[in-house]
Amino acid sequence: MTDTPRILITPSPLSDISTTINKPNVHPSMSLLKALPECRLVVKSKGDKNNANVVEFPLDRHKQLLIAGKVYHDYKFKPRKSIFDRVTDPNYFAKSEFRGFYVLFWLSMAAWVLQLYARSYWQRDTLLGLPLARQVFRQFFVLFSSDFLMICLSFFSYGLQVCIEKNMIRWANLGYTIQTLWQGFYMVLAVYWVKHRDFPIVQCVFFTLHCAVLIMKQFSYSHHMGYISEIRILHNEYEKLLKFVRECLNSTEKDEKYTFELTFPNKPAETISTLQAEEIVALTAKYLSRQMRSEVGNVVYPDNINFFNYVDYLLVPSLVYSMEFPRVAHFRWHYMAFKAGSTFGLLALTLALVDWYFVPSAVAVKDLDFIGKLRIAPLLMNKIMFPAIILYLIMFYLIFDCILNAFAEITKFADRGFYGAWWNTVTWDEFSREWNKPVHVFLMRHVYHSSISGFKLKKSHAVLLTFLISALVHEFVMLLATGKFRCYILTFQLLQIPLYDLQQMFAFKKRDILGNVFFWIGMFTGPSFLCILYIVF
């Protein structure tokens, strides 16, 4: 037994492996999983002249299945406030030396929006330009009824998991194929409906992005639960085997009747004792059992496969599924009112900026020829550069600090780290990780880590694949919104990879301020340049 990995565990602590869970460390570490034996466990009958196998368990394959499941525990949800909620907490804010700048910024935004609406009223006798007003409120009822229908259709993924849990179908055989075809149909339906209804750009972007969110939520839910359903089937088989092995331990007659072997691909098989077989089977069964529990350990599959759990997941501001999210104790009405008020105020500012800076720019180039557009493009870029970066910041705050925090408060979701301090970014890869945490976690789990574990890609290739998929989705949204297939945003996003390499050069290495200056130059010029490209060309 010198070449066989030693399983350092006694049988007694594993006697109740299905119910006993060590809460502080529910899921085994990668090092523990890698310590499992790379072989097959074979049970043979001593009296069989043909030396046929009674049962055979591919421990190596099951080990790889357990290791692949680590992808569903690559991000730990934990209670935390968003950055702006922390810095505006009364206890912190009153002591901050920068509180005056925070107040000044929002007063400046309020003064700006009042100025723009006042100018609109004096010059046009209306608070909002007629073309934009028509666009914003066009097909309003159709938009939200269509969105509600797409939400209802997403329950197909829940129904499929119910069928899998009831053993009507298996995820590995038919479930995966059905889910893939369904999500393809769901995406085609969303695109068809956008084009069929001819939604204006605002409605088109909202509907498309929300459908993309629903697709990602369904993908994460179905693949996570599908994986656990396969783990449950395998765990039940190991439970039966463990019962059989323990019967052999307790019965001299059975112990003398059966023999246990470990077979290896490149060396002779080795006979092991019944006690050693019990150790190996019990440990593997224990790890399989823990895969069916939530990260904290309080929820066990299939208890989470129910209607209300899925509804809760749709409302929770997370794109990846977890069997048990951290929660806050109380719902705060004053907090919800503040976020709702902030949302409407920021929407008013957004409409004013679009009305006075972006709509006139689009109108100015509408009837020009190509040469005329080239001549006016630099002037338009200069005009919208500052409004574009302000609009970018406002949209970031609106989505990630107001809307997501509002849904977090509704569901009492405690992990509100929806973004990091991306404004201090030194490299572009840091920006891609920090500015949109929900999407980053989804891509990290279901693209980056899954491509490494499932397709054996190198890390560099997995990074490229992740950036490519993200860029293609952004370009597809712009195609639907503008009707133009130009690959501008696709190119700019993929340029982040060589820009990261550029920032690793000596000129930027260990010069965080210089790197941050380089980042903000890109932020000032990038959004405005993209706007001009899509407006003019």
Swiss-Prot record:
UniProt GO BP: ergosterol metabolic process; lipid droplet formation
Membrane protein topology class: Multi-pass membrane protein
Pfam family, one: MBOAT
The keyword Acyltransferase is assigned to this record: yes
EC number: 2.3.1.-
Motif FYXDWWN motif positions after renumbering to this chain: 418-424
Record-given protein name: Probable sterol O-acyltransferase 1
The keyword Transmembrane helix belongs to this UniProt entry's keyword annotation: yes
Main location: endoplasmic reticulum
Glycosylation positions in this chain: N250
Top-rank EC class of the record's enzyme: transferase
InterPro entries documented for this protein: MBOAT_fam (IPR004299), Oat_ACAT_DAG_ARE (IPR014371)
Transmembrane regions listed in the UniProt entry: 98-118, 140-160, 174-194, 199-219, 344-364, 384-404, 462-482, 517-537
Location of the protein in the cell: Endoplasmic reticulum membrane
GO CC annotations, alphabetized: cortical endoplasmic reticulum; endoplasmic reticulum; endoplasmic reticulum membrane; perinuclear endoplasmic reticulum
Keyword terms: Acyltransferase, Endoplasmic reticulum, Glycoprotein, Membrane, Transferase, Transmembrane, Transmembrane helix
Function: Sterol O-acyltransferase that catalyzes the formation of stery esters.
Catalytic residues as annotated in Swiss-Prot or TrEMBL: H474
Recorded family membership: Belongs to the membrane-bound acyltransferase family. Sterol o-acyltransferase subfamily.
Gene Ontology terms, MF aspect: ergosterol O-acyltransferase activity
